Amino acid sequence: MDHYDSQQTNDYMQPEEDWDRDLLLDPAWEKQQRKTFTAWCNSHLRKAGTQIENIEEDFRDGLKLMLLLEVISGERLAKPERGKMRVHKISNVNKALDFIASKGVKLVSIGAEEIVDGNVKMTLGMIWTIILRFAIQDISVEETSAKEGLLLWCQRKTAPYKNVNIQNFHISWKDGLGFCALIHRHRPELIDYGKLRKDDPLTNLNTAFDVAEKYLDIPKMLDAEDIVGTARPDEKAIMTYVSSFYHAFSGAQKAETAANRICKVLAVNQENEQLMEDYEKLASDLLEWIRRTIPWLENRVPENTMHAMQQKLEDFRDYRRLHKPPKVQEKCQLEINFNTLQTKLRLSNRPAFMPSEGRMVSDINNAWGCLEQVEKGYEEWLLNEIRRLERLDHLAEKFRQKASIHEAWTDGKEAMLRQKDYETATLSEIKALLKKHEAFESDLAAHQDRVEQIAAIAQELNELDYYDSPSVNARCQKICDQWDNLGALTQKRREALERTEKLLETIDQLYLEYAKRAAPFNNWMEGAMEDLQDTFIVHTIEEIQGLTTAHEQFKATLPDADKERLAILGIHNEVSKIVQTYHVNMAGTNPYTTITPQEINGKWDHVRQLVPRRDQALTEEHARQQHNERLRKQFGAQANVIGPWIQTKMEEIGRISIEMHGTLEDQLSHLRQYEKSIVNYKPKIDQLEGDHQLIQEALIFDNKHTNYTMEHIRVGWEQLLTTIARTINEVENQILTRDAKGISQEQMNEFRASFNHFDRDHSGTLGPEEFKACLISLGYDIGNDPQGEAEFARIMSIVDPNRLGVVTFQAFIDFMSRETADTDTADQVMASFKILAGDKNYITMDELRRELPPDQAEYCIARMAPYTGPDSVPGALDYMSFSTALYGESDL
């Protein structure tokens, strides 16, 4: 702190002469003090319904000065003088100054006359003295007071805020953050402190002044512009304004403390009243529950059944487990609440709580003791009754269990013993029934002990006077009667089963013999029927003769088969005789086979019917095979002549196409003679087609008399026609090429010789490698380097545009003719158009129509693009691009 700060801190109540000199040194301070002191005075005078406008004028008569002192001190001053004379005014001011002096304040150099005369310095000094005495002197923080106390209070309140460092009452407040921090510390909802900036003091100061005036009832005692524009704000003005914050916030804190004290007292009283109500209700509920429970525990009427007594025990357990524990907790909580309530009343100087009559803790303890005494006796009675009934219930349950097991075992046994299932059973079933019956007899003997135990238990229950003895006796008697009846039925069933077994054993032997002989005979008949009905497929006379021989051998075995059939039927008749004699009720058929006599007779009759049908079918097939053989021979004779003829013609045409005898016209004439002879041969092909149609209708699939099929003949004939036509066309094209390109016969022969030389397989085409070798032989320089490969690829694209991988002789001739003959080019056509155009770079539609035929002129006009050169005229056409397009060098 600088020297000025130290002086101000130690001498805040310094004589007026000192602060008078300070005031004269800085007019800005005087301005700040006038505004601040005026606002401070008005903040108190408004409580009396008045205010001042000019601090040195409005206090001159002493009336408002006395009123100000009465407001801030809360005391009454002497009655003021109401006169308007100077003496009256001085008297009133002196009364005010005397009151100030009575408060222990020394007034040095301040006289009533200066105040009445409107001396600004003296008036401000007097007001500052009043502010120090009534607004600042009583401030006390820890061991400091007055100015030091106010400064310490500001430092404590603003300590948590960034960029706030209060060290004095002048420059520490220039940025306005100190005022904003004081407001935010006590009323954080009024200012968003986080948005404030230290470099914007005007906004900070105005924000604090506006908020303090609007929400804290602290008048605006300072101007933000004066504080910011002054190097050192007036300390007295700042202290006066800050003291208003102190009193505003300290008053609010006192009110809050008083309200908290009242709320605390009321809360304690309300809590005690609630505890009293809770005790009364809890005590009433607990006593009512005890009153209802004791009669239930005193009821000792015994039950006849164990179930009923167990239900009572279960109810008692529920009482112990579910109902009583919460009540024990309630009783304990009741005592705790009572003791807690009494303690709280005693600590808060309230009278002790006295519950309603009959609801004292001792009353509840007495009722609870009665409950537990009755409860103990009830539990002993329950256990004794349960032990008493337990023994009877055990015997009764044992009787019921054994009786139920026995009845479940005997259920259906009488019906089983009475049934006559053996009358329709097979031998194996009879043996199984006997085994089953023996097992039942063993089981019956084992159940004898249980029947005796049931009777003994029933006797004991009667002796113990069981309450339900009549039903036990009736059930026991029924079991004994049923047991005697089961014994008689068991013996009767055994006798019937043994008698039936003997008869069925005899029948079973006959069934077995029948099955052993019927099965192979049935298989023989089924095989015979399959063979007789088998659809045979033969293609030769030898095959049908073999089938006929096998059929005759089969017919020779039929007499012996008929004897076996009669023997098998005799066995079945013997079984029928035994069944009729002894009245055996057969439940099923022969267990060893499913073949019946009716089935044997039916199949035998079917075999006898199929034999003559087979004879007829074999005879008809033999005649058909003889006819087919004649067709084979007829077709073979013709095919063996036509096939070689076609092959010969194909070879002759091939020789003509590659030989170089005579001119091309001679070759063409020779080929046309061949074509005529081939056409004249067509009737023989048609006749062969007719014979082939007959063979197909007869379903003949092979022919040992020839190696030629109709398909071979057709393919050969079509190839022959195609070959002669293609060869004639090739020769005609060669003639056209020769004439158009001016190729001599010698050149044509040379080309043919070279082509034939490299056509190793005589296919009429050259592969890429063969074609390359042919070109080299003709003098073309085609190497294996990249340039040579590119040249050969170009040539191949010309001779094989479809990329088939072969070069025909015609393509070879076309290529060679282009290479050796003079042909039209795009340049020649352009030169011709230039002549028609009069040596211009374009041509007009009129010129085209004048020089060319109409259709060709219109063709050119439709396809020529407009000419766009610098010498163009309306309607000019570009004949140059048209000419290049004709030869594929550009798009048409």
From Swiss-Prot:
Q: Where is this region: Actin-binding?
A: 1-247
Sequence positions bearing Phosphotyrosine: Y12
Q: Which residues form the EF-hand domain?
A: 746-781, 787-822
Pfam families on file = CH, EF-hand_6, EFhand_Ca_insen, Spectrin
Q: Where is the Calponin-homology (CH) domain?
A: 31-135, 144-250
One molecular function GO term is: vinculin binding
Residues annotated with N6-acetyllysine modification:
K95, K195, K676
Keywords assigned: Acetylation, Actin-binding, Calcium, Cell junction, Cell membrane, Cell projection, Cytoplasm, Cytoskeleton, Disease variant, Membrane, Metal-binding, Phosphoprotein, Repeat
Gene Ontology cellular-component annotations: brush border; cell junction; cell projection; cell-cell junction; cortical actin cytoskeleton; cytoplasm; cytosol; extracellular exosome
Q: Where in the cell is it found?
A: Cytoplasm, Cytoskeleton; Cytoplasm, Myofibril, Sarcomere, Z line; Cell membrane; Cell junction
Task: Fill in the subunit field for this protein.
Answer: Homodimer; antiparallel. Interacts with MYOZ2, TTID and LPP. Interacts with DDN. Interacts with PSD. Interacts with MICALL2. Interacts with DNM2 and CTTN. Interacts with PDLIM1. Interacts with PDLIM2. Interacts with PDLIM4 (via PDZ domain). Interacts with IGSF8.
Q: What is this protein called?
A: Alpha-actinin-1
Question: To which species is this protein native?
Answer: Homo sapiens
